[in-house]
Design a protein with these regions (language model features):
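N-terminal lobe/hinge region of extracytoplasmic solute-binding protein
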Residues: 33-87, 120, 196-198
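Gram-negative bacterial Sec-dependent N-terminal signal peptides
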Residues: 1-21
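Glycine-rich and polybasic anion-binding loops at the starts of cofactor/ligand-binding domains
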Residues: 532
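Mature extracytoplasmic/periplasmic domains
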Residues: 339-357, 538-540
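Short, P/G- and charge-enriched loop/turn segments at secondary-structure junctions
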Residues: 66, 137-138, 185-192, 198-203
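Extracytoplasmic/periplasmic ligand-capture domains
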Residues: 21-24, 65-67, 84-85, 92-130, ...
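Short N-terminal segments immediately surrounding and downstream of signal-peptide cleavage
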Residues: 24-37, 170
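Surface-exposed binding/hinge segments that line
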Residues: 131-181, 205
């Protein structure tokens, strides 16, 4: 309780801290450290939050989400609505008026052509766009004039605020990326590492999986911002050293994703150099169960693809047994304390969308054993490991290097061992695991394992695009550079049909019911996604840094232009 009070008090003090700007660059260097290093500066080539945060300092969308979940215009004059004529009465078009006078960091004009091009870039079927679900249902994107963009949908769309809204869908400069369409997307190294943007900073040096160096954008539209002349974003550190670099040594101003044990949090707060800030949204630590065979005996290009169904997980009783064996409350108590809560939902928030899905919250070891018995998995030779038709019930369980995740792995392995499942644990450097490199065998998109654990979320308060990631067509595969969003390779035509129906549902109550049903279809009904904990965003902030406004619905750096040094 003391820790909770300290966290809330620190956040309140920070929220009311004064932020005054003398002139652009007057506060010297901003130093950010991430527990996971950035691998790219192009949000469209990565699903990793580490990359999306880093890129958001440079590239901007037409609109962003504020901490209260409401939208704010960024590169647009206003948010299009039915009332102001920006959204058509039939729900089939949305028209954005662009902010006049905006310059790219190279001094050229930002225009509607850049917006249209960005849509073409992501929707190219050969490009492997990691944010393709943000463009779901779009028929065409047109430049009406240099400052007006019209998006037309194939069917009436009740939530047209997806493409170009939030940190996942920024605008790319057409001039820089026009030769990077389709299969060329991932090979445009210069553009992907040093994008020309409209945001407050410009990349001057980028070392993948290590460090990014920025300078203030000389053409940023607010002449007084950013307050910092330069910024350094260092990565590759674990959560503990990231937190220490802010809270104990004071070497850094901001530490992203400081997942550390509750008792250590309290000790660091007592040092008096900083505070931890939290914000609850849709961030869920989960297990993903691979519905395809990841065996290394298969030819490269066929592993973890629909050509080969998983030999064990094709039986839902096995998947259910693995979930039943887990004590989620104990995981949260040991791993997160006040910074998380147990959940069975992929969509735990906002409350209006959260399913009454609580069946997984009580551990049921005997129920898990019974399910495996019914599925025909028994210990025929008495070695403690179940087998069936000569095959051992043996799984590879991978995740990123992180002390809490390794604790979770050890605990879950023991619970699974207790029900007769053999488990091999694998840990991967987070910069590689979340990096999206099509040439690496260790990315979470390739999923060369049976089970993997990570956390993911969506921007904004509407999970429409997030849930649309799990349609059949979005499974990662070699043809799209392994950039698909459907990580477990889940495929259910009924799910796909309900996604399509939801896109055109206007009634809020019916829409909420659809979201709950979609959530249940991938969790308790299919158990391909096994939620563990609804995590708060949890980062360390120096007492010398003001203006930070923790945001659960957008990039944590969504207002980095407003950050400054305490006077």
């Amino acid at each position: 309780m003391k820790l909770k009070t300290a966290l809330m008090g620190a956040a309140a003090l920070l929220a009311f801290a004064p932020a005054a700007f003398a002139e652009r660059g007057s506060d010297g260097e901003l130093k950010i450290i991430q527990s996971q290093a950035a691998s790219t500066m192009n949000q469209y080539l990565s699903s990793g939050t580490k990359d999306i945060n880093a890129s958001s300092m440079v590239s901007e969308p037409l609109a962003s989400y504020k901490p209260d979940g409401t939208m704010m215009p960024r590169l647009a004059v206003e948010i299009p609505t039915l009332e102001n004529g920006g959204v058509s009465a039939d729900g089939k078009t949305i028209t954005w008026k662009l902010l006049p006078g905006v310059k790219w960091s190279d001094g050229t004009d930002f225009t509607a052509d850049d917006v249209v091009f960005t849509g073409q870039y992501c929707m190219d079927p050969a490009g492997g766009c990691a944010q393709l679900s943000k463009f779901e249902g779009i028929d065409k994107i047109e430049a009406v004039d240099p400052l007006t963009v019209k998006i037309s949908f194939k069917e009436p769309k009740t939530n047209p605020y997806s493409a170009f809204v939030g940190a996942l869908a920024p605008i790319l400069q057409k001039k820089q990326f026009e030769k990077c369409l389709g299969a060329n997307a991932s090979s445009c190294t210069d553009a992907n590492f040093k994008p020309i943007g409209t945001g407050p900073f410009v990349v001057t040096d980028f070392k993948t999986n290590d460090v990014a160096v920025f300078v203030a954008n000389p053409n940023y539209r607010d002449p007084a911002k950013p307050a910092f002349a330069t910024a350094t974003l260092k990565g590759g550190n674990d959560a503990m050293s990231t937190a220490r670099a802010v809270m104990e040594t004071g070497e850094y101003d901001y530490g992203w994703n400081t997942q550390i044990e509750p008792e250590v949090q309290a000790q660091m707060i007592a040092a008096g150099k900083g505070k931890f800030m939290t914000a609850y949204g849709g961030l869920v630590e989960r297990l993903e169960l691979n519905m395809t065979d990841a065996s290394s005996a298969l030819p490269e290009g066929e592993r973890s693809t629909a050509k080969h169904p998983h030999p064990i997980f094709s039986d839902i009783r096995v998947r259910e047994a693995l979930s039943k064996a887990i004590d989620r409350s104990l995981l949260v108590e040991i791993g997160y304390g006040e910074a998380a809560r147990p959940t069975c939902n992929l969509v735990p928030a906002p409350e209006m969308f959260a399913s009454d899905n609580t069946g997984c919250l009580t551990q049921d070891v005997e129920g898990a054993k019974k399910l495996l018995d019914e599925a025909g998995w028994t210990d025929s030779d008495g070695d403690g490991i179940r087998d069936k038709d000569g095959k051992k019930l043996s799984l590879v369980y991978q995740t990123s290097v992180n002390p809490i995740r390794q604790n979770f792995q050890a605990m879950i392995k023991q619970w699974w061992n207790d029900i007769g499942v053999e488990v091999e644990l694998k840990q991967i450097d987070p910069s590689v695991f979340f990096g999206g490199d099509a040439g690496s065998p260790d990315t979470f998109q390739k999923f060369y394992a049976d089970v993997q654990m990570f956390a993911n979320e969506w921007d904004g308060t509407d999970p429409q695009a997030y849930l649309a990631q799990l349609t059949c067509e979005k499974a990662p595969k070699p043809e799209d550079q392994w950039q698909g969003e459907n990580i477990p390779r889940f495929c259910n035509p009924d799910y796909d049909a309900l996604i399509k129906e939801m896109l055109t549902t206007a009634d809020p109550a019916k829409r909420a019911d659809q979201i709950k049903k979609l959530n249940d279809m991938v969790t308790k009904d299919a158990m391909v996604t096994v939620p563990l904990a609804n995590r708060a965003r949890f980062s360390a902030v120096s007492n010398t840094l003001v203006g930070v406004d923790m945001n659960a619905w957008d990039s944590e750096y969504w207002n980095v232009a407003d950050w400054s040094r305490a006077k």
